[in-house]
């Protein structure tokens, strides 16, 4: 799978692009089966990210690719590794982690505006996340982005339900602006999506999502380019990689079995 040149240009400019019809139906079916298996047998890392009184439910799970055969096949056979390398401008695309996000119909819990990279244990500019729905997603329930925000500074990561600074110390990074207070002032991107569509975004692009008007099963897979290095934190990252610092020192390339190279494919 290869991209038209203007797609990579738009990604570099806006920090988010839609890849319409990027996946063949067989890959969507494979991924859907993997998500359903994951929901039926969640890993110890799974969590409910909605409040107990929410009429729906928001479930997340992380780092399941080595335990879920459908996820593994999807990551290595879907062609997204090559797309990642092209978007990043990197000769290689290395898996960082997978992330399953399912909002059941009627879920009220929004995903507040945030950047992803401040929650992580990596430094570097070459990165991309793919947001892959296996159900139709309305524009109102889809992920949305502030175009160009990936070119700005890191902003304070906070917990989604109580806005606590559980990662970087309070005051060490600037807080996010109140985008919802004046949405018209911001260049917001978002798209209605069908199974087979993929959204690609940079880990520093500000993004959010509303609740779900119908069931919304999504798989997100995140890739790192050649400039990515390990950045151990003094706090648990999200997701966390316990013990990794003993094997991968600060500043080292992310060359570790947890993060295999997906593109180019091994011969």
Region spans (language model):
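Non-heme Fe(II)-dependent double-stranded beta-helix
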Residues: 1-13, 20-113, 119-121, 236
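Non-heme Fe(II)/2-oxoglutarate
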Residues: 34, 45-53, 158, 198-200, ...
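Active-site region of the double-stranded beta-helix
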Residues: 90-91, 117, 133-143, 148-150
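Generic beta-strand structural signal
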Residues: 91-93, 97-98, 109-111, 126-132, ...
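Feature marks short, surface-exposed loop/turn motifs that line or immediately flank catalytic pockets
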Residues: 104, 138, 152, 207, ...
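A short beta-loop-beta micro-motif enriched in histidine and acidic residues
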Residues: 115-127, 186, 193, 214-215
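Short, conserved beta-strand element in jelly-roll/cupin
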Residues: 121-138, 192, 200, 222-225
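Double-stranded beta-helix
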Residues: 139-205
